[in-house]
Amino acid sequence: MAKTNSYKKVIAGTMTAAMVAGIVSPVAAAGKSFPDVPAGHWAEGSINYLVDKGAITGKPDGTYGPTESIDRASAAVIFTKILNLPVDENAQPSFKDAKNIWSSKYIAAVEKAGVVKGDGKENFYPEGKIDRASFASMLVSAYNLKDKVNGELVTTFEDLLDHWGEEKANILINLGISVGTGGKWEPNKSVSRAEAAQFIALTDKKYGKKDNAQAYVTDVKVSEPTKLTLTGTGLDKLSADDVTLEGDKAVAIEASTDGTSAVVTLGGKVAPNKDLTVKVKNQSFVTKFVYEVKKLAVEKLTFDDDRAGQAIAFKLNDEKGNADVEYLNLANHDVKFVANNLDGSPANIFEGGEATSTTGKLAVGIKQGDYKVEVQVTKRGGLTVSNTGIITVKNLDTPASAIKNVVFALDADNDGVVNYGSKLSGKDFALNSQNLVVGEKASLNKLVATIAGEDKVVDPGSISIKSSNHGIISVVNNYITAEAAGEATLTIKVGDVTKDVKFKVTTDSRKLVSVKANPDKLQVVQNKTLPVTFVTTDQYGDPFGANTAAIKEVLPKTGVVAEGGLDVVTTDSGSIGTKTIGVTGNDVGEGTVHFQNGNGATLGSLYVNVTEGNVAFKNFELVSKVGQYGQSPDTKLDLNVSTTVEYQLSKYTSDRVYSDPENLEGYEVESKNLAVADAKIVGNKVVVTGKTPGKVDIHLTKNGATAGKATVEIVQETIAIKSVNFKPVQTENFVEKKINIGTVLELEKSNLDDIVKGINLTKETQHKVRVVKSGAEQGKLYLDRNGDAVFNAGDVKLGDVTVSQTSDSALPNFKADLYDTLTTKYTDKGTLVFKVLKDKDVITSEIGSQAVHVNVLNNPNL
């Protein structure tokens, strides 16, 4: 049986070493030389590096196979050796398909080290190939590369957008380990042995541990904000842990082949124009970095049209990471961004709807299209360096936290179109099951996801669908086709969130098997008509459009339904399988209507009880309780849920059978307290609209006589904060780190007051929780009932957010400003405490808190 690609989904199970040059048996090749790796081959140096490390020995025939794909078993061997993992000769991995094979002990070693995982079904696929995205994921994990990233990650390759490996690939790009291929990154392409050797060697040289006994440094210079250049001997023996810099730490080191020079990558940017002490083992050096901008390039990026937190990116000089505007300001440089449409007219794409900016931050809600953006960097009192680039604005994936509801619809018209987010048309119908018949086609009719804390129908352009088996169900532009009998899982993705839907494809054509009536027991007054909704379904539970010939109505001999008085047809466009039909009471009595197919098999039934048409009672009742004679009309109306409630004057027979609503022409309705609520007659209904909390009597009269009465209690029940979900935080060790409310609480930015996520309330509400952004009431949390993003009359105060520093803190630049709390400096050490309180003036009203510890590395008290 052919292998599936299920192991490719196990990103975390595809290890880094698997991408390195392959070993298909533990037979050694002679020396470094491989006949199929000629001198000058682009990966020769990396292959030789791994040979020197004892990580690879080649294939049994003495070749290397640089163009062949690497398998996972061979990778386990290489990974074990490159990391010097302990190997138990008798060890067996937990994977059932990797036991008692030549590489078992190596697979066991990397599994024990936490480097690899299987597919979740006890499989490892030792002979399986590895794609570039899976490689990137494990390379990042094995060498802890995420902690070594400098600056924000930016997606520069369009084929990475929405891909599961987007972040991991961007980390490799950020660190200079990968540069893509021909304008693409090709995340799904299998990695060759030569490519694997190149990636592993580059990474190990920069981030692998080394013996530093023979290293000696003669000079240290800051070559760029995040780089040190060391000169000396034996520098190839140094590791990043051997280098320290005040206020920062080294995260990687890359030495020249002869060990006479090395480039050190720092975790942050050095302070400009300041004497800095650098220590390499037991040696100490003082250096200063004077920043000079010589070259500038605007990154050609694609941005989302309505996403907050986006900014123009540009690179300076030959630095790999993106430039930092705040850092440039510290280095006595001013930055200006100028945006124009392609015709040269100003483009108001920056925050505040401006065409120029000093931060490069984009507005939310930008018109889609291409724009020209010029970045100007000017040294104060000196020259200006500038560059213009093109950026693209599109509707990219929607940031979602959960996929709540997925509805597929069958394209029964076979026209290649299924309405999305709206009523279906023609013969198309929504699927209740996950069953398809061979040859059927379907697509999404609706997908609801939680976006910014609110359940919304997702834009179809933000959705991607992949099939686990294209031979069973194929997918083209999210349009699925049942190709053959079997099972396949559709993985639906919105942003970084996925949901799996398992479909079964059969060869059993759809047929009508059920007719259900709602209600299935009908009490109706003679000569009156009441609605009955009929639902017709097939053997899978999906809607079935039944025409006149499909259903035979067998009427009871009691005559409760007249001959020809009922014809169940459910083929109306847009509502296949469902039809509401008026059933008229004929003769007084009772009986059951049976529904049969052409073969006489019973599909369902409807019991009908027809009573005499005398109106004995009239009952003033809630529309929501029509037909429930004797129920009290008194009710409670919560203004936080709805502002209106409806009544009608219902007619009942002497048997308490509901007939129909009374015509209210000639009737009058009165609210006895207009300050609390008013009441109006609208058609055959009385509509009561609440204004303010209190009780009010509603009287319905005709010619002065009371026809109905109800008491409505208007309430506005208290909503309070039940708990708070704070963001996880880490100790801040570096300078120039900004700490504010956004450090501990997830915010959805707004030009006015921001929405605060993670505030759990005592009752559900459709209104947003916001925080006052500025002014005397900064930090006030409130329920924005009118949705205007400003606290005013009618909104509900929920509590306050505050920030303070502990008494033992040494944070001289601390401000009790939630949006500008602290920018860390070289001697900062202490703790900031963010609290959510019911009342900021009552310290015992705390609901929750989150502490942020600050401990900058060069603090003299450490």
UniProtKB/Swiss-Prot annotation:
SS bond partners: none
A Pfam family of this chain: SLH
One of the GO BP terms on file: adhesion of symbiont to host via host extracellular matrix
Gene Ontology annotations for the cellular component aspect, listed alphabetically: extracellular region; S-layer
UniProt keyword Repeat present: yes
Alphabetized InterPro entries for the sequence: Cell_Envelope_Struct_Comp, SLH_dom
Every SLH domain range: 30-93, 94-151, 152-214
N-terminal signal peptide: 1-29
UniProt keyword list: Cell wall, Repeat, S-layer, Secreted, Signal
A Gene Ontology molecular function term of the record: structural molecule activity
Keyword 4Fe-4S on entry: no
Subcellular location: Secreted, Cell wall, S-layer
Chief localization: secreted
Record function comment: The S-layer is a paracrystalline mono-layered assembly of proteins which coat the surface of bacteria.
Descriptive protein name: S-layer protein EA1
Lineage of origin: Bacteria, Bacillati, Bacillota, Bacilli, Bacillales
Gene from which this protein is expressed: eag
